[in-house]
């Protein structure tokens, strides 16, 4: 059954662009360990070095800490450091803020990587109208399940 699921996922993702594949697998990554592993595999196979692809790779490194038993702290630290560096070099990229906000919402609070939630939320809301239609749809999907955005903020993303 897992083999069939993996095959269908691979087939589906083959016909998508690399960025679409990353986005789609990232959306589902927190729903199960299998989906987390699929996202990590897709991220690792990416050859692009653009900021968005690199940010998804950093998020994959952080998420890998959820499913491994060794080096968890090192994975989180390395991924978070990479993600922060990417955002520092691309401060006006909304998708990078969505990625960081998502990571910070889903990482255990004890890790201490949640200081940018309010900042990223406001940045996303303030810059939403200037994004392309595909990214707007992605942001709305993220906002719908966000723990940081309230109902009014979610409704403002229309």
What are these model-derived regions, one by one?
Residues 1-21:
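Bacterial Sec-dependent N-terminal signal peptides
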Residues 27-30, 58, 63-70, 106-111, ...:
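Short coil/turn linking the two alpha-helices of tandem helical-hairpin repeats
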Residues 27-41, 72-80, 113-114:
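Helix-turn-helix repeat elements of alpha-solenoid scaffolds
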Residues 57, 62-64, 100, 138-139, ...:
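Structural register within alpha-helical repeat arrays
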Residues 123-158:
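Terminal, low-structured helical/coil segments at or just beyond the last alpha-helical repeat
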